[in-house]
């Protein structure tokens, strides 16, 4: 029997390199903040810096958690599923820290804390996302899976997609000027959702490399379009003028290109893994003869 706190061991009690890697990944932002504690403390707004760090990493780890399903198929490595729960609970820990630090920033005044949240739309959206993640974290144990039943548990945890969307909206709305990173994050989220939708539509667990290339292109186009429309609405300019800058790399690499590069990289990994699996299968067939 593995103790709940022994996160580095798998279900059989063996030391797990994969779990150690996941735990290291989750702890890295915390360790970095501790190392930079003196620098943060002497900054203009230390609590605000920590609030944003915790929120940013919560969003990053939420994306990593959502990426487990497609990547265990693309990498042909089913054991990745073993760290999904750890990543999900780790995501909740960061978003809980995000909210706790915000409470501290309000001088631990419950009235002020509630007033701030209920009078700002992006904070209301963030609070809803937090409540949703809290519900998923509370029901992530094996005991809750048995209590709810497999079907009900899966339906409940499908709420993660809506929660991720709310988290992205919250991130966008609290970003004051440059929306490059939020747009890139939105593009990656769109890819993750589109992957699932395309796999469902094709009724397959593994998309072909060609499908992944098409997916990368389609999602990057939507990312370019979404960014152009968003900037056009925010700054009252033509979206076509925004799109004209997509090839102007002197002003920076637009999120659409970043999403395209990420999508093509995934397709390349899939092609390599497919070829490696075919070679392994042929070698085993020859050995069996």
Functional labels for PLM-detected ranges:
Residues 1-289:
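Membrane-embedded alpha-helical bundles that constitute the cytochrome b-like, heme-associated redox core
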């Amino acid at each position: 029997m593995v103790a709940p706190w022994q996160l580095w061991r798998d279900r059989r009690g063996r030391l797990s390199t994969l779990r150690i890697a996941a735990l290291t990944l989750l702890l890295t932002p915390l360790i970095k903040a501790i190392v930079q504690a003196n620098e943060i403390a002497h900054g203009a707004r230390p609590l605000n810096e920590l609030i944003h760090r915790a929120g940013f990493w919560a969003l990053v780890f939420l994306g990593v958690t959502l990426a487990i399903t497609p990547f265990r198929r693309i990498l042909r490595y089913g054991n990745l599923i073993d760290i999904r729960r750890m990543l999900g609970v780790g995501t909740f820990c960061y978003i809980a820290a995000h909210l706790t630090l915000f409470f501290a920033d309000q001088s631990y005044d419950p009235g002020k804390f509630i007033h701030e949240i209920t009078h700002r739309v992006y904070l209301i959206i963030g609070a809803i996302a937090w409540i949703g993640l809290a519900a998923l974290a509370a029901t992530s144990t094996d005991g809750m899976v048995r209590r709810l039943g497999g079907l009900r548990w899966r339906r409940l945890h499908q709420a993660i997609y809506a929660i991720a969307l709310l988290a992205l909206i919250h991130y966008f709305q609290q970003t004051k000027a440059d929306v490059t990173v939020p747009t890139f994050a939105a593009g990656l989220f769109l890819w993750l959702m589109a992957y699932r939708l395309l796999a469902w539509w094709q009724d397959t667990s593994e998309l072909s490399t060609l499908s992944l290339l098409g997916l990368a292109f389609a999602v990057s186009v939507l990312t370019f379009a979404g960014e152009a429309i968003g900037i056009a609405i925010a700054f009252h300019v033509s979206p076509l003028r925004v799109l004209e800058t997509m090839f102007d790399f002197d002003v920076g690499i637009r999120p659409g290109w970043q999403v395209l590069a990420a999508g093509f990289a995934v397709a390349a990994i899939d092609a390599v893994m497919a070829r490696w699996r075919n070679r392994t299968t042929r070698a085993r067939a020859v050995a069996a003869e």
